[in-house]
Amino acid sequence: MDLPAVPSSVLEALQGSARSLGIPRLALVGGVVRDQLLHQRWGRDWSGVPDLDWVVEGDTAALVAELSRQVGSERISGVQTHGSFGTVALQLDGIPLDLASARQEHYPAPAENPVVRMGTLQADLSRRDFTINAMALDLVTGELIDLHHGQQDLASGQLRLLHAGSVADDPTRVIRAARYAARLGFQLAEESHLQIRSTIQQWPWAWTHGDAALSAPPALASRLRMELERLFEREPWPQALDLLEQWRALPLLDGQLQNDPERKLRLRWARRLGLPLMPALLLGAADPVATAQRLQIPGKQQQWLQQCVALHNWLADTPPCLEASPSIWSTALEQQGWQPEAVALAVTLRPKPWKPLLRWWGRWRKIQAPQTARDLLAAGWQPGPGMGEELRRQRSAAQERSR
């Protein structure tokens, strides 16, 4: 299998270093193998080489040292070592490489972080999420290793979980399934679809909705959020969210999100207003603030959600009348101390008086008094409450003129 845009000098240097040390396996793994097969055999567009992920049956630190000895340190840059298994990131001739020792893992409890130990390439491939991501190109032998029939699923456009306990072990795989299916245009294999639905219905995890938010295991908390962030940042997210809804998988986030008819409108408004999509999505949850805490979204976004919920309740109780002037609406909103993003999030909910909120977000809040405190002092005003009142009066008048 050829690797376009990867210089042969890079491959030869890695191959030579592995052979010098007697390393039995040095294999390219992950999305680059999948995408290159799709390109070569099925004519998919080649989007260029991402970071290259390699699995080593042996000592990665020793391999990097031998590589440096053979090619010279001037060709290698940015060497960083991470973790107890000697994962090494570097650049060889400007090409990013990530090398990791082969490993195997088991889950001490569903949705907890796995326990990892050294293993073989075969074990490393068997711990992955989908058959199409569990292939490897062995640089030492030139062999394409496909233990789980990933090529067959590529040919048929199927996305298949690797084993029967995949979702129970790591529910973030469901979000990844939606990401890949939306990006590649693949169909979820029937048994994988059944596994997702039945696992979520059975709910094998120790934590459940209503429990303390911060007691959720990582794959139902921060790691679930990270997959959602990747979905919003990298993928055709409207299609991916539709798939999660079709698979009845949104209860992983919150049961109410599974039946959320306003989701698409909320997210369209959030994008239009330049807001992060995550808090707009979570506004459809039964308890948006608790869900945000569990997923550990950024603190400022949690604050926006808290304020948005408070604003929504305020609108239901004692808002200004719909026909109130710009200055009255501005004063009422600003006295509450709500951040602008919280008001914009409230717009995505389309409450009955949503237009004044939108106008405040887009225009009224940005209007300033035509004069500054320095101007008033120069005109003979004395410092004190009266000067502040005059500046507020001027700003209100300017807001009224903006109707």
Segment roles from a protein language model:
Residues 1-403:
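Catalytic cores of the polymerase beta-like nucleotidyltransferase superfamily
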